[in-house]
Amino acid sequence: MTRRAPTAWPRSARVASGWVAFFALLLVVWLGTPAIAPIVLTLGIVGILEYAAMLRLRGLLVHRTTLLVFAVLVLPSALGWGDAGGPLRLLAPGREALLVAFALALFVLALRRPHQESLTTVAHTLLGLVWIPLFLSYALDVRALDVVGHGAALLVVLSVVAADVGGYVAGRAWGRRPMAPRLSPDKSVEGAIGGLVLAAATAPVAMTILEARGAVAPLHGAGAVAFGVAVAAAAQLGDLAESLFKRWVGVKDTGLFLPGHGGVLDRIDSHLFGIPAGYLLLRLLGLA
């Protein structure tokens, strides 16, 4: 079985692609929900292709077409386009109903063409449905919130980014104790703490600046701190989940989407957990 060797990119390529990704992220936060839908869809499609390619390295099957169709349909469903009537009214029940329908369809396919790996294929496809397009679609919900949508998106994204940056810097400077040596030897307890601390510091400052510019901040003070820490913790869990998957497959990067930074899943792994966690918290707080 072939394993993909890591690519050694020049430092200049890593830095340049890193800045491109950073400004693209700011653009996503700034734009309105309909405008960012194509960006989210593109990330979802590329992520699915990377996911299917990694499973093939293990000699495993996945219903890639089913994953891609779900990704295309779940975004209009999240945007509420089903309320427009016509053929789109099939999307009106929402993405959760769409997930149930696709899950049932997968089992029907398995029953029609049973083979030794039928249930394994269903399981891997369901994991892909939830992990990539479903979780990613909550970015649209956060940005679409009335009044606080801009601030909520900024709060969630900055909390995730702070978790990544703080974890990297603190881990390089003070990392001593491995957090998950079997999954990712480079990640340390000190790095995880650094990510949480930076998120706790970034969230309230960002909300203060946001209000100073005339926008509406969804949370303030201690509330913003607690929110930032919770989202950062979810982001770190998402990072570890992707490390678990890559360790199981036997690859260093999920792809070559960004030079020196790996694939799309390598870049959005933290967001895939941080964004839905942030939206859930906003719902629990009555802000969504």
Name these PLM-found stretches.
Residues G166, I193-G194, L265-F273:
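Membrane-embedded alpha-helical segments of transport systems
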Residues L280-A288:
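Juxtamembrane boundary at the C-terminal end of a transmembrane helix
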